[in-house]
Amino acid sequence: MQYDFKKQLRSFGYAWQGILSCVGKEQNLSFHLIATVIVISAGFVLGITRAEWTVIILCIGIVIAAELFNTAIEKLVDLVSLERHPIAGQVKDIAAGAVLVCAVAAAIIGLIIFIPYFSGL
């Protein structure tokens, strides 16, 4: 199979459309994006190290990706199950739980990185 650059660009375009379709419409994603701006701003102000930036960016990416997966799962469940069903609710809860695990882990990592900077003030 030959590589098709135009097809690759279209694929990236579809991915961006997917992300943008959630921004401003999903409350939890909006919360995580606001937290991202705050964390990145704090990183610049406090002058965190390259290694710390690497960990912070990885945490941000994991949480945002988890939130996007959660949104996709919720929409798919809504499409497949038009009426309330206990398993559909459980699937949504499990997906939301995965986001919570990622977000809590990221918050703890953030505290580990940022607290030493504030204790020196």
Residue locations for each model-derived region?
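Hydrophobic alpha-helical transmembrane segments
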Residues: 1-72, 80, 84-87, 96-121
